[in-house]
Amino acid sequence: MATVIPSPLSLGEDFYREAIEHCRSYNARLCAERSLRLPFLDSQTGVAQNNCYIWMEKTHRGPGLAPGQIYTYPARCWRKKRRLNILEDPRLRPCEYKIDCEAPLKKEGGLPEGPVLEALLCAETGEKKVELKEEETIMDCQKQQLLEFPHDLEVEDLEEDIPRRKNRARGKAYGIGGLRKRQDTASLEDRDKPYVCDICGKRYKNRPGLSYHYTHTHLAEEEGEEHTERHALPFHRKNNHKQFYKELAWVPEAQRKHTAKKAPDGTVIPNGYCDFCLGGSKKTGCPEDLISCADCGRSGHPSCLQFTVNMTAAVRTYRWQCIECKSCSLCGTSENDDQLLFCDDCDRGYHMYCLSPPMAEPPEGSWSCHLCLRHLKEKASAYITLT
């Protein structure tokens, strides 16, 4: 069934006029908004749409100028671009003469006299002051942005030339983003690795890592240089190491054999606690006999050292050495520790090139030395692995 639309006249004349007024004001606001809009890119046609100025009002109509033309509308208002102010005084023109500073100014020269000359000089000094102020404000803004500006720019903007005075050298400014990123990475590295080597500047996450770095890098270099080139080693460098060790209250591994507590008969006094669990025996929870190093005196539980039953019984039959004091049982040296091969039954160390026949690569699985093979025979770890 069709809907019956009531006539506007039946609603009243006041209501009709109010509706027309609302419609007119809405159209006026819409047209004003469209005229003030910036051009936008149409995604379908790729054209930058802008106000077309084709909508005119009755007040814009004019009489026709050509035959058969009823109305004419005014063209779009042309706006002149702003340009530099042209000097009105014809005498205020650029100077075309070379000025000799030593010679006195001639009245017949190209420079004008009186108030015009004063105006030229004042304008020239004023322009220089304005340029200097602009340069100072630019530099201040750039410094402030480098310190406080929050957002990051591309890394490609790291180096940009800054305009300076004509007689000064050109400098380079660092982009805000690159400097900020480098500061962030540096602060993150400082936070993650707070322990710094005072000689080479290398960073570590914990103090044991820094101590290991000192011992195996700088201390070894110093000991080698003391024997070969004693005069080439700076004195303050050795003092830095000694001061660091005193503050740390830590003895390097290379000096532990000399500073270990010794009995009157010359034997090393072992520690009375486990260096791994500090006496708690966390792995088994039961009391265990400590195994002590014959060189440095450090001790450990067999369970903390991950020793097998055969290994625990074998280490008590000879002068056992911890992993840091370990040396080759054949040649007696601790050099080339990367070539040391450890027995899985007695924990003795052997250089692979000291064995007979020598080995080029470590064997796969368990390995037993010739002493354990002779003593344990079929109970050796090497036989168990093969079977």
From Swiss-Prot:
Tissue: At embryonic stages, predominant expression in the nervous system. Expressed specifically in postmitotic neurons (at protein level).
GO molecular function: zinc ion binding
Cellular compartments annotated: Cytoplasm; Nucleus
Keywords, ordered alphabetically: Cytoplasm, Isopeptide bond, Metal-binding, Neurogenesis, Nucleus, Repeat, Transcription, Transcription regulation, Ubl conjugation, Zinc, Zinc-finger
Binding-site positions, Zn(2+) 3: C328, C331, H351, C354
ZnF (PHD-type) residues: 271-328, 325-375
Binding residue positions for Zn(2+) 2: C293, C296, C322
Cross-link (Glycyl lysine isopeptide (Lys-Gly) (interchain with G-Cter in SUMO2)): K106, K129, K133
Positions annotated as zinc finger (C2H2-type): 195-218
Annotated function: May have an important role in developing neurons by participating in regulation of cell survival, possibly as a neurospecific transcription factor. Belongs to the neuron-specific chromatin remodeling complex (nBAF complex). During neural development a switch from a stem/progenitor to a postmitotic chromatin remodeling mechanism occurs as neurons exit the cell cycle and become committed to their adult state. The transition from proliferating neural stem/progenitor cells to postmitotic neurons requires a switch in subunit composition of the npBAF and nBAF complexes.
Family statement drawn from the similarity comment of this UniProt entry: Belongs to the requiem/DPF family.
The name this protein goes by in its record: Zinc finger protein neuro-d4
Gene it is expressed from: Dpf1
